[in-house]
Swiss-Prot record:
Disulfide pairings: none
GO biological process, one term: intracellular protein transport
Keywords attached to this entry: Cytoplasm, GTP-binding, Lipoprotein, Magnesium, Metal-binding, Myristate, Nucleotide-binding
Annotated protein name in UniProt: ADP-ribosylation factor-like protein 6
Binding site for GTP: 24-31, 50, 69-73, 130-133, 164
Pfam families per the UniProt record, alphabetical: Arf
Family per record: Belongs to the small GTPase superfamily. Arf family.
GO molecular function: GTP binding; GTPase activity; metal ion binding
Lipid-attached positions, N-myristoyl glycine: 2
Primary residence: cytoplasm
Organism: Caenorhabditis briggsae
Recorded superkingdom: Eukaryota
InterPro entries (alphabetical): Arl6, P-loop_NTPase, Small_GTP-bd, Small_GTPase_ARF, Small_GTPase_ARF/SAR
């Protein structure tokens, strides 16, 4: 099987390696989501808050992801932007039950969407409205309105409801991200 994998990679039929940056406020579920995307045998049993960043690898049908899981505490947020220039996609995770920090979420998300290395390159941004299992969580439509996303015209973004603990919604969101990244890579070839 190793020979066939090598042969398919040689002829460009293997999985394409891509870098993504995973950002969001502290306690939004970034690391738990990435843990769900790994194979069952490589998942961590205990999730601890990220300090700085951690690289997590996982694959979809066509892409092999190197995900830079960025810490969400205020003192680390300024480091996010240094990873955008070498990425082909961004995942922004938010806690859909955290109504108190919605204005802060809006500010941070718009900084990402408008960042020169995101907006000018047209890299896709997938927003994961996590913790939808919590009673009183906002819907994607409510979050879109609260964050003013309907006013944001540049770039490619989408929003998806997820639950990191169960994995609900992650397959659909990752299919969307994979599709958008493949489109992005095709436009870069020409």
């Amino acid at each position: 099987m190793g020979f066939l994998s090598s042969l398919s990679n040689l002829f460009g039929m293997g999985k394409k390696d891509v870098n993504i940056v995973v950002v969001g406020l502290d306690n939004s579920g970034k690391t738990t989501i990435l843990n769900q995307l790994k194979t069952p045998e490589t998942r961590s049993q205990q999730i601890v808050p990220t300090v700085g960043h951690v690289v997590t690898n996982f694959s979809t049908q066509n892409l092999s992801f190197h995900a830079f899981d960025m810490a969400g505490q205020m003192k680390y947020r300024s480091t996010w932007e240094s990873y955008f220039h070498s990425s082909q996609g961004v995942i922004f995770v938010l806690d859909s039950s955290d109504r108190v920090r919605m204005e802060l979420l809006k500010d941070e998300l718009w900084l990402v969407l408008d960042h020169k290395d995101v907006a000018s390159r047209g890299i896709p941004v997938v927003i994961l409205a996590n913790k939808m299992d919590i009673p009183g969580a906002m819907t994607c439509a409510d979050i879109t309105a609260a964050l003013g996303l309907n006013l944001h015209r540049s770039g490619t973004w989408s929003i998806h409801s997820t639950c990191a603990l169960t994995g609900d919604g992650l397959d659909k969101a990752m299919q969307q991200l994979s599709s958008e990244i493949q489109k992005y890579l095709e436009t870069r070839k020409s």
